[in-house]
A protein has these predicted regions:
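Active-site-adjacent "subsite" loops/lids of carbohydrate-active enzymes
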Residues: 1-22, 29, 72, 80
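Short intrinsically disordered, low-complexity coil segments enriched in acidic
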Residues: 2-6, 176, 191
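Active-site-proximal substrate-binding groove within the catalytic cores of carbohydrate-active enzymes
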Residues: 34-35, 39-190
Length: 191
């Protein structure tokens, strides 16, 4: 149906009407600024989450993104999180059966993970091991959330052991460290 107005105000009105808090910009390299301005104009600000990578300036209104990464041994630092510590990335690696890399990179970067089991009708269930790891990471991250927007975030903080990587998250008088073991074996000793 023709709403009688351009898409940005029509979408903003609809999102306000249904009480939505955001829009997933599937396949988009950034939700255009016009949508954010229209949402603000109707008094119903929205979180925009494009699938692709928006321009750096678009982080001002694309406050979330998907994180579709390669997972090298040394964890990559999420560019958008680095530029804007309040930016929330949701790691999406929908076809991978082992979610270890997703969870480690999310934990290292202080960002989220998208648990997507039914991918357009194709089942890619989460294993009991990954489900338990997800529960543990969420249990640690939820009470520490204020640290993960620290402008003093220091990714790739030096560590003593091979294959052990950390991010340092200072906030006031306290600091949180997120530490990941990228080895395929356990590591013990001072870090």
């Amino acid at each position: 149906r023709d709403p009688g107005v351009t898409c940005p105000p029509a979408i903003a009105d609809l999102m306000a009407e249904v009480g939505a808090d955001g829009i997933n910009g599937d396949t988009q390299d950034g939700v255009p600024l016009a949508f954010s301005l229209a949402a603000d104009k109707v008094g119903h600000p929205l979180a925009f989450e494009p699938e692709g990578g928006p321009s750096d300036e678009a982080l001002a209104w694309n406050v979330m993104t998907w994180g579709q990464y390669k997972f090298p041994f040394v964890p990559m630092v999420d560019k958008y999180k680095w530029l804007e510590p309040r930016h929330m990335v949701n790691i999406s690696d929908r076809w991978n059966r082992d979610k270890t890399d997703d969870l480690q990179f999310g934990f290292f970067n202080g960002v989220g993970w998208e648990s997507w089991e039914n991918i357009w009708g194709i089942w890619n269930g989460i294993t009991p091991r990954d489900a338990e790891a997800t529960r543990r990471v969420a249990t640690m991250e939820r009470p520490l959330a204020p640290f993960f927007i620290s402008s003093g975030w220091e990714p790739l903080t030096p560590m003593l052991r091979y294959g052990i990587f950390a991010s340092r998250w200072p906030s006031g008088p306290q600091t949180v460290w997120t530490i990941v073991n990228r080895n395929e074996y356990s590591v013990e000793g001072p870090q």
